Amino acid sequence: MGKLIAVWGSPDSGKTTFSVKLAEALYNRSRGKSAVIVVFTDIVTPTIPVIFPNFRSEDVFSVGTILTKPDFFADDVVSNMVMTKDRMNLGYLGYKDSENKHSFPDYTEEKAKYLYDVLVGIADYVIVDCMSLPDSNFLTSVALEKAEQVIR
């Protein structure tokens, strides 16, 4: 069972940068043997296009796609992760460019909890880059609730 780490703080405080750097450090410390997943919860300003600016839109997937499915499993989550070829144990989940809170139907708190249960079941570390306002979405509020460690 993996460890859920939530990164939370004020707007523009470097949460996303810290989340990516922490994921890289954990991945490198294990020499690529630890599976690390970063979840970007920001639906207002999607992070995936910022982290992967040169990826084609068909090579980038959305966490919103997973959350709108009636049922999903570990394979569905893995197939919707963004990974680079040289770091197959380092995955990223988040929203794509041009997506916003109106792009997908609403999902439940239980579905967010289930997503994190699936993620900690398949990864050694799950790092959640939370939105500054915990009530902004269930991905943020559930991560702060379920995290073994909250970095602020």
PLM features per residue range, with description:
Residues K3-F73, Y125, C130:
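Walker A/P-loop NTP-binding active-site region of P-loop NTPases
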Residues S13, S98-S103, L133-D135:
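Short acidic, S/G/P-rich loop/turn micro-motifs used as interaction or catalytic elements
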Residues V20, P105, E109, N137-T140:
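Conserved strand-to-helix beginnings and helix N-cap segments that scaffold or border functional pockets
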Residues S30-K33, R87, V120, L144:
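Alpha-helix termination/capping residues and helix-transition junctions
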Residues S34-A35, N89, Q149:
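Residues at the starts of beta-strands that form the adenosine-phosphate
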Residues V38-G121:
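P-loop/Walker-type NTP enzyme "switch/lid" segment
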Residues Y114, V120-G121, Y125, C130-R152:
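Conserved catalytic-core segment of NTP-binding enzymes
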